[in-house]
């Protein structure tokens, strides 16, 4: 039986902080965290297509805050906001948010539903990004019809030691 690193019933702050750190980090920093914890799959809940506001992206700031409590030198909440102090998800999103694994998993291929254009994110009443964020360390394994459930498989390390982005 496989264990779950973190779920809604987790009361152990370091576990939640670790999941938050992986999701808040750029792929190249998130991948070693996922591998260190033997993660095979990553599940996210995305309500942008259906208008479900209880999704992971809306809960993401809590993950960031909890992670910042353990890693204040690495995770900084203010970097996820725009220069005007807003939590925006479209092309106006901060570079830190756009580079995060969470953002990439959320919006990967989303604009394909809208003919390659920025699609409407109904959960945040905002446009999504105009281009699909690329993923180098995860493969999309499953996306439900309404895009509410998305599952990604963590890629296995390259046998030749190359970066996954170079080994594709």
Describe the predicted segments one by one.
Residues 1-168:
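Extracytoplasmic
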């Amino acid at each position: 039986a496989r264990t779950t690193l973190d779920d809604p019933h987790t009361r152990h702050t370091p576990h939640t902080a670790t999941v938050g750190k992986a999701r808040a980090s750029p792929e190249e920093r998130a991948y070693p965290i996922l591998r260190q914890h033997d993660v095979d799959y990553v599940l996210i809940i995305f309500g942008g297509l259906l208008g479900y506001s209880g999704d992971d992206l809306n809960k993401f700031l809590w993950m960031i805050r909890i992670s910042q409590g353990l890693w204040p030198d690495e995770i900084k909440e203010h970097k996820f906001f725009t220069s005007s102090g807003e939590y925006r998800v479209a092309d106006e999103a901060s570079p830190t948010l756009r580079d995060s694994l969470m953002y990439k998993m959320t919006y990967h291929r989303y604009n394909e539903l809208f003919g390659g254009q920025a699609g409407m994110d109904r959960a945040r009443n905002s446009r999504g990004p105009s281009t699909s964020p690329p993923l180098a360390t995860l493969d999309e394994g499953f996306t439900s019809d309404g895009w509410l459930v998305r599952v990604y498989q963590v890629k296995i390390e390259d046998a030749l030691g190359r970066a996954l982005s170079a080994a594709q």
